[in-house]
Amino acid sequence: MSALLQLNQIFKVFNEGTPDEKIALDHIDLKMKKGDFVTVIGSNGAGKSTLMSIISGKIITDIGDVMIDGKDVTYIKEHQRAKLIGRVFQDPMAGTAPKMTIEENLAIAYSRVKTRGLSSGLSKKRRDFFKEKLEMLHLGLENRLQAKAGLLSGGERQALSLLMATFTEPKILLLDEHTAALDPSRAELVTKLTKQIVNEYKLTTLMVTHNMQQALDLGNRLIMMDKGQIIFEANEEKKKSLTIEKLLEEFQLIRGEKMNSDKSVLI
């Protein structure tokens, strides 16, 4: 099966030629087949978020190619890639417009892909569609379509952001530590919704997480990043036998550095 997402020798450096020069990504290669759910772990500065931003088009790579479904999108702008990619950020405030209603937020997200105006997005047929999708969240938001998004809790906003990023079934879903800012109960809810939505729509998903156990529990593949490189990969079969302890051992074996806890490799 051909790759739905393919990264070829991605290299990105920031502040080149200055004392603050930093290689964020060091010739990264990555292939994901349709339906793959890859979890990504790594320390602060490992290059995880830069990787996400290069895939989404927010940042342009210095060297290398980004291919989506066989098309070279390396230099295609972020707003043009939005038809192919859904993304949920760590900050619950980042995915929604706080002064707009739930309904208006959903209509805008829908129009990005369907290239229709806001008015058509608010038709009765579209409103019924939004209600149907909101019911999946089990948060009662289908009865609060006229509520401002800014009045929702962090967990509710993140659940809404997840729905907005996925209900048009993008080719690729990017989840950038999307539960990290939530309290444990809401993080558990959003994680459960993530698994449900990804499985239902068979979405090709790349998820960065600060939580090793979450990385082990979700997805069919796992990669570990450090200093701009992918230093460890586990396919579905290998991933089933992994534990946090084994991941820490792998890091120590590869880098020659001992990690004292699961958090130390992630923060």
Cite the ranges covered by each PLM segment.
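A short, flexible loop at the N-terminus of ABC-type nucleotide-binding domains that lies
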Residues: 3-4, 13-27, 77
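Conserved beta-strand-loop-alpha-helix hinge in the C-terminal portion
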Residues: 229-253
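ABC ATPase C-loop
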Residues: 165-166
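H-loop/switch region of ABC-family ATPase nucleotide-binding domains
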Residues: 209-210
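ABC ATPase NBD coupling module
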Residues: 72-86, 94, 116-119, 123, ...
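Helix-to-loop junction immediately C-terminal to a conserved catalytic motif
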Residues: 56
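The feature captures the beta-strand-to-loop junction immediately N-terminal to the Walker
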Residues: 41-43
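Conserved ABC transporter NBD signature motif
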Residues: 64-72, 232-234
